[in-house]
C-alpha cells in the first residue's frame, strides 16, 4: 500500500511540475516582437491610447472614425512597422500618469500631450512634434482680453492639462475662480451656456472650435508657454518603438509628409 501510495504521490509531483512548467510557458510575455525589435501588446497592431475629443489632434468624424493630426502621424509609424493602428479612447489621467502604458493597455500614447518634467518621470517621450500655445476663449463681444480682466470671474479649465496648470499659477494673484471640467466637450459647452466667462486650452483646439462655430466665439488672448507635444511609450519599456517613432517623424519632416498633415489639420506651418 505504501509503495502504491508513493507511486501515486510521485506521479502527482510529476503532473504538478508539468503543469507548473506549462503555466510558466503560458505566462511568457505574449506581446509580439517585430523584426525591428519593437514590442507590441497586440500582434499585427500598433495600439495607441488617446482621449476624445481633442480636435484637431483626435476626434471622431461623422462616420465615427477617429481622425486628426496625431492620428495621421501615428498612422505613418504603424505603416513603417507594417501593422495597422488601433486607437483606444481612455481618460486622460491614465495617459498622463503613465498607467495605461505601464499596464499594457497600449503601446504608445498620442493625445496632444505636452512634454513636462513630471510626465517624463513616468514615461518616455518622442522628439517634440508640435509647438503649442495656450489661449483664452470667450463669447464674441465679451470684454475679457486678459486674465486680469477675469478677477472674481469663473474661468474654465480642462482636468489634467497644462492649460489648467497655467491658470493655477495665476489663480490667487489675479483672483480667478477656476472651474474644472473632465473633457474638452464639457469645457466648450460651459463657455457656450455661460457657466464660465472664459476658458483656457491649447490655441489649435480653439482655432478648430472657431471654424465649426463661426461668429459666436473668439480667442481673446494667447499665452506663449513654450510648450511642445510629444508621443510617449512605457518608461524604459520599449526603446525600439520610441526609436521608430523618432525616425518616422524625422523622415516625415524631411520628405514633406509632415507639412502636408500639418496644413490639412492646423493650417500653414510657421517658418522654423
Give names to the regions the model predicted:
Residues 27-36, 84, 164-179, 217-220, ...:
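Ligand-binding clefts/hinges and TM-proximal coupling segments of bilobed small-molecule sensing domains
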Residues 79, 84-149, 218:
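Acidic, polar ligand-binding/catalytic clefts
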Residues 112-121, 168-169, 192, 197-225:
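A ligand-binding cleft/hinge motif common to bilobed small-molecule-binding domains
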Residues 20-24:
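C-terminal motif of bacterial Sec signal peptides marking the signal peptidase cleavage site
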Residues 32-111:
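Extracytoplasmic small-molecule ligand-binding "clamshell" domains
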Residues 52, 130-138, 203, 207, ...:
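Periplasmic-binding protein-like
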Residues 52-55, 66-80, 113, 132-185, ...:
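Bilobed "Venus flytrap"/periplasmic-binding protein-like clamshell domains
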Amino acid at each position: 500500500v505504501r509503495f502504491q501510495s508513493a507511486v501515486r504521490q510521485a506521479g502527482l509531483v510529476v503532473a504538478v511540475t508539468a503543469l507548473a512548467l506549462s503555466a510558466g510557458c503560458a505566462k511568457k510575455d505574449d506581446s509580439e516582437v517585430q523584426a525591428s525589435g519593437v514590442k507590441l501588446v497586440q500582434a499585427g497592431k500598433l495600439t495607441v491610447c488617446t482621449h476624445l475629443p481633442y480636435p484637431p489632434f483626435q476626434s471622431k468624424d461623422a462616420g465615427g472614425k477617429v481622425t486628426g493630426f496625431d492620428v495621421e502621424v501615428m498612422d505613418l509609424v504603424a505603416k513603417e512597422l507594417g501593422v495597422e493602428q488601433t486607437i483606444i479612447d481612455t481618460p486622460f489621467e491614465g495617459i498622463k500618469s503613465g498607467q495605461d502604458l505601464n499596464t499594457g493597455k497600449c503601446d504608445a500614447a498620442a493625445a496632444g500631450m505636452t512634454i513636462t518634467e513630471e510626465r517624463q518621470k513616468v514615461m518616455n517621450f518622442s522628439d517634440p512634434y508640435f509647438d503649442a500655445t495656450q489661449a483664452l476663449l470667450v463669447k464674441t463681444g465679451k470684454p475679457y482680453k486678459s486674465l486680469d480682466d477675469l478677477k472674481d470671474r469663473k474661468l474654465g479649465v480642462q482636468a489634467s492639462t497644462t492649460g489648467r496648470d497655467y491658470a493655477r499659477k495665476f489663480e490667487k494673484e489675479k483672483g480667478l475662480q477656476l472651474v474644472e471640467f473632465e473633457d474638452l466637450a464639457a469645457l466648450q459647452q460651459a463657455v457656450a451656456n455661460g457657466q464660465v466667462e472664459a476658458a483656457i486650452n491649447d490655441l489649435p483646439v480653439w482655432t478648430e472650435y472657431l471654424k465649426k462655430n463661426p461668429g459666436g466665439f473668439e480667442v481673446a488672448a494667447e499665452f506663449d508657454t513654450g510648450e511642445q507635444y510629444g508621443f510617449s511609450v512605457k518608461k524604459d519599456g520599449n526603446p525600439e518603438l520610441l526609436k521608430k517613432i523618432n525616425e518616422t517623424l524625422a523622415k516625415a519632416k524631411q520628405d514633406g509628409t509632415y507639412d502636408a498633415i500639418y496644413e490639412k489639420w492646423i493650417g500653414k506651418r510657421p517658418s522654423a
